[in-house]
Amino acid sequence: MIGLVYSVEDPAGRGIASYIVEALKPHRTTNPYAMEYYEGDGFVLAGFNEDVIYFDFLEERLPMVSEYIVLSRHSSKAGVKSYTVHHTGNYGGEALSGGRPGELGIASPRTAWLLLRLLKTYRDAYSRNEYEVSYEATHHGPTSLSKPLVFIEIGSGLDEWRNRVNHAVVGDTVIGFLRGGIRDECIPVIGIGGGHYPRKHTELALAEPVCYGHIMAKYALEYMSRVVLDKMTERSVVKPVEVIVEKKGTRQEHRSLLEEYVSEKKLSLRYI
């Protein structure tokens, strides 16, 4: 059972949810914890009052769900128009945006990869070429769930969040995923380096059957350690078999640690 979840206070998430309701006609029913609640074929759709970064309660409120997809807005100071996918977690620091310090959520590499590819398909189908399709590096909460969770987002301002075409792009992406529109398999990996929008990692995932779990952007490399790398590989529904590193922006000390780590763990290592 897939749980599609959103905040009723978020115009992007609620707009995507409304599109899915219009398209799939799920049965509206009640849930004591949800403001809006629907049941469909193989999925539930639930809207909550809380902001999505504080959705650590999902397992208590939706115990029947095996995997969560969060429908959400994305904010960017640069104003980048985007459709993005990412996993959750805090590599270090104070966890100012939900979750716990030093904790990563459970990644679902194949789900995130399928959503990324479908986003590109529907971005092109709706001629939204001004929108970037991208992974984001792992960030923010929730982090404490024992089931996998993936965010899919519209960026990056109120006009984009309210736009009905954007709701259709992301809504059709989610519907395509629910219907099994892409059945391809992929090689699970983790990513190191690159910016918050790790373009080289995204380009690789769109060109090859490699699907990313956690991605650590270059701004988070100060937190990289064996312990953190263990979390990146273990907090996933499937064990990664390769570590892919954007070489530019990583220092020799990072590369040395990674080379020792992959040798010890019998993982492949690739620089891009």
Swiss-Prot record:
Its EC number is 3.1.1.96. Binds 2 Zn(2+) ions per subunit. InterPro entries: Deacylase_DtdA_archaea, DtdA. One of its GO terms (molecular function) is zinc ion binding. Keywords: Hydrolase, Metal-binding, Zinc. Gene3D superfamilies: AF0625-like. Its cofactor is Zn(2+). One of its GO terms (biological process) is D-amino acid catabolic process. It comes from the Archaea. It catalyses: a D-aminoacyl-tRNA + H2O = a tRNA + a D-alpha-amino acid + H(+); glycyl-tRNA(Ala) + H2O = tRNA(Ala) + glycine + H(+). PANTHER family: D-AMINOACYL-TRNA DEACYLASE. Belongs to the DtdA deacylase family. HAMAP family: Deacylase_DtdA. Monomer. D-aminoacyl-tRNA deacylase with broad substrate specificity. By recycling D-aminoacyl-tRNA to D-amino acids and free tRNA molecules, this enzyme counteracts the toxicity associated with the formation of D-aminoacyl-tRNA entities in vivo. This is D-aminoacyl-tRNA deacylase. It comes from Desulfurococcus amylolyticus (strain DSM 18924 / JCM 16383 / VKM B-2413 / 1221n) (Desulfurococcus kamchatkensis).
